[in-house]
């Protein structure tokens, strides 16, 4: 069974070795550029010689792997001066550290010349930190802080990038109770106290418990070195006493200062007064307590006074505070805003500031541009005339009522006159019915445009009785009064009516002279025909 197993292993090894040899042969053939590179070589000449399998070799290989590698062993052939010069050259010129340089020298069997020649053939691993490098870095960091250029002066074989990388990895694993931290605290306390007495600093109980543990170890080593086992007991008791003294400040070592805090000063007279009698300290404390209570009362009283003043100040500030606009200025005109602007023009006329205040979200310039842009669309000129007429009416309200009454009475008289004036103008006998009807129809067509109200006002219904037509409302006469230059008592609608009746009489005379109809109507029917189209 063992032979079969060894045969299998040998075959597998043969395959692997043949593959390696074939690759190696192909590389050599490619280097030599033979023409038959793609040929497969078969035969015993092209096979590797495989040694027999020895199971004892595996254990020996394992033992070798578990052993540590020797880096350096001193030799009398190399002097200390030569060794220092070799290490300095390896560090400055090739970037080796001390351990790597000594390993190279041991590899060449303490031959300095061969080691110096072989240093340039290898590149040292830059991130490898020895214990010595770590201690030097902590010392440099305690002195210089994060000034990595100064730290590099203490570690010349390290690059700044390597120092920064190691700093962040060291910062994560850094503990508060390290030796360098304790040394930094001691230096800080020395700087703050500004004392030159080093013995007081060494006897200061403001150290950590780890420092005491290290002191225990050192004392134990000293006792073991001296061989006095019985001396361990009193040393432990002394250390426990020290621990009890420093237990109060173990987490806050900076509180164990000899000087009082800022703002407190020790005077000899006060100390003498306190030490004179036992009750003086209690009396002083009571006085300080009463003083503290009185000061607290004063603070509370001042707070109450401030709150009252603050409330009084807040009562009247709202009246003096300017009002913020509720609506933002918007240049777009909605339908509601347009209608509101038209009504505001009817109310305020061209007072654009008042119109802008009514709308709320428009400026005076926007209102004026609206008046110019929408003047024809909303007939703002007529609306403005109505406002002007209303202002004139409000200025002379009594006179306006009288003029309206006189105008209505004169309108009735003129209509009666129009009925009586038409027959005398006829040169021939009475006009025919057709002529009178055509004349009345033309007068009826010409009279309504003169008595129509403005476009924004509702016209009178055609089926209204004659009494309403003879007395128009004030809104219909107001725009017509503005057209007269001097506000004469007779309205302007009467004169065109008289002229039209004269023109109609002339037309009737011409028609009666040319017509050959024999039927003639009495004069009384002419006046009746004039009112008949208006009643319809």
Swiss-Prot record:
Compartments in which it is found: Nucleus
Residue runs in coiled coils: 283-315
UniProt biased composition (Basic residues): 249-262
Disulfide bond residue pairs: none
Signal peptide positions on this chain: none
UniProt keyword annotations, A-Z: Coiled coil, Nucleus, Repeat, Repressor, Transcription, Transcription regulation
Superkingdom of this protein's organism: Eukaryota
A GO molecular function held by the record: transcription corepressor activity
Family affiliation: Belongs to the CoREST family.
Role this protein plays: May act as a component of a corepressor complex that represses transcription.
Protein name: REST corepressor 2
